[in-house]
Amino acid sequence: MEKKNKKTRLKIFDITRDGKGLGKKPSMSRSGFKRFFVSYKDNIGKITSVNIFMILGNFPIFFLVAVLAGYTKAEAYLPFSDLFSGYSGAFVSEGVTPDTMAMFAIGGVQKHILVPTALTYVFYALGSLIVFTFGFVNVGTAYILRNIAKGEPVFVWSDFWYAVKRNWRQALIYGIIDVLITGILAFNLYNLVFGETGFVTSMMFWATVILAVLYFIMRYYIYVQMVTFKLSISKIIKNSLIFALVGMKRNIVALLGVLLCLFLEFLFVFAFGGIFISFAVALPLIIFISTMAYMKVYAAYFKIEELIIEPYYEEHPEERPVDEYENDEVLMRDDVTERERLAEVKARNGIRTNDEEE
């Protein structure tokens, strides 16, 4: 009895006992919300590499940031009053008296300003190169992120340059258009926020906000279409406008994801402070930018597939790509027991089983 119990206890270490087998898991939707997180987790290294491409490829923007931050400018003081020179002369000639002090206190007030230097204009010139690099980077990264969303094998370096070489003309042209449109919208918003207030200004502000959001959503689809179809830029823009309105549900979810990333960045900088400022600087350089881009591509591609690709293949089934693995020989089955697997392994290696020895 004791031997039997001992044998039963040690049975848990017996590799020949039948295994639990594979459980039946419900299949995930190819374009579903849950699959986004699975795909993101499985490809986080590649998405990080895409972020590096975005940062290094758009290097001219760092020169513009340096200019806007004032690092290339010199300090100066500008008087508020046109009578500053007269008051200043009286102050110098008459000396310090109650009258000159009163006059200088009224007309001698100055404000601190930053004035451009030669280095500022050099940085402006270097920063303007963004109009040439922006389209290339967006095309290359859109191709990589689209393939990740589709579940295809991705080779980040070669895929990036393949997409750039294949679409460089459209990427260059639309990259310039993209920078100009984005710059105009940002400039209008800045002036409307910090300019004079009024009913007309308020209406113009909200109209600009709506246009900016609409164009931001259109950009989900522009570069994905560029690397997927052979279409003219005008047709790509037209289709993107249609997709921005038709695919509202997916577009809004992606927009909320982008806003969540920006909100976290805001918290790290202004709410938490301290060591979290380091995270606020590091995250956009490592993962945040490509994460937001992947959200947009994931939302866009499957809507494009639903409304353009699948209907086309239904009308032209002979052009549908054939699955190259469909007719491959089965290498492993899951309908056999662990004991049968072990017997097969022993047979292949010329090892006799206990039954054969008997």
Predicted feature residues:
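Juxtamembrane "helix-exit" motif on the non-cytosolic side of transmembrane helices
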Residues: Y190-E196, L267-F276
